[in-house]
């Protein structure tokens, strides 16, 4: 699958919605897991500001990659962010978009990061 690395070095990023489990199947409520590690996947909505534009991105992150208290407005660093184009067909309708995944989302707020 194609992956496009996203450079976050010139961006300001902060939490828009705290982490929550990523749902794999809405019909059954099944929670998504990382294919390699089996870790629960989490979704963190972030405000991504760069080049005078602001976007809200939903970023999938393995649960161990979430560090620090991530509440609304918390500035964060995103490690290993990639964009993945996707397309599917459901009930005869074609849909497409871009999904985002990261290795880690780390709080930059003083005193909130967990000790390693």
Kindly give the residue locations of the regions a language model identified:
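OB-fold and OB-like single-stranded nucleic-acid-recognition modules
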Residues: 1-116
């Amino acid at each position: 699958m194609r992956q496009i690395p996203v450079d976050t070095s010139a961006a300001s990023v902060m939490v828009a919605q705290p982490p929550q489990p990523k749902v794999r199947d809405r019909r059954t409520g099944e929670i998504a897991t990382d294919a390699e590690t089996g870790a629960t996947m989490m979704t963190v909505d972030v405000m991504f500001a760069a080049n005078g534009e602001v976007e809200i991105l939903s970023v999938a992150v393995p649960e161990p990659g979430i560090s620090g208290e991530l509440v609304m407005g918390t500035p964060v660093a995103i490690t290993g962010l990639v964009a993945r184009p996707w397309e599917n067909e459901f009930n005869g309708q074609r849909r497409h978009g871009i999904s985002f995944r990261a290795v880690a989302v780390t709080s930059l707020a003083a005193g909130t990061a967990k000790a390693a």
